[in-house]
Amino acid sequence: MINVEIVRNYNKWREHKQINKSLIKKITQNILLRFDNFSKIKQFELSILLTNAAEILTLNKQFRNIEKATNVLSFPSNELNWQDLYSKLEFLGDSDYMHLGDIAFCYEVIYNESCEQHKTFENHFIHLLIHSILHLIGFDHQNDTEANIMENLEIEILSYFGIFPPY
């Protein structure tokens, strides 16, 4: 079971009714089912903040020391590494609950990027959601090898949902 908490701090998000708990749960479940190590955990929780440029700028400055609005920020609850998920999950014990983390999305940046890249707002959001969840479970793109692995997984998941790959 996946519990999703959504906080909408910016009214423009309400125009996108298809961005809801059901969509976020479906995508999260699709990602987690790709990793056998998550099968022991019965309940996952994910917190989503749908906000604006001013708030994301504050968060980006506070947590990354970058004074710029960004499309999305991911805050993992656990220090997971996709290459060693089994031992990391064993370390967490026999808990049947895991809070994956928090994700903050910025409406204005996502809107501008989707226009510039000729994508629908929703498809761009889905791509960023997939990208962020992968960060929460230990994926990164600090070097070319990691970036290729993460991008290929994103492409595979996007294709499953009928979305053309952005790369």
From Swiss-Prot:
Cellular compartments per GO CC: cytoplasm
Subcellular location field: Cytoplasm
Protein's job: Single strand-specific metallo-endoribonuclease involved in late-stage 70S ribosome quality control and in maturation of the 3' terminus of the 16S rRNA.
Protein name: Endoribonuclease YbeY
Cofactor(s) it depends on: Zn(2+)
GO molecular function: metalloendopeptidase activity; RNA endonuclease activity; zinc ion binding
The organism of origin for this protein: Rickettsia peacockii (strain Rustic)
Pfam families noted in UniProt: YbeY
Gene Ontology biological process terms, A to Z: rRNA processing
Cofactor note: Binds 1 zinc ion.
Residues engaged in binding Zn(2+): H131, H135, H141
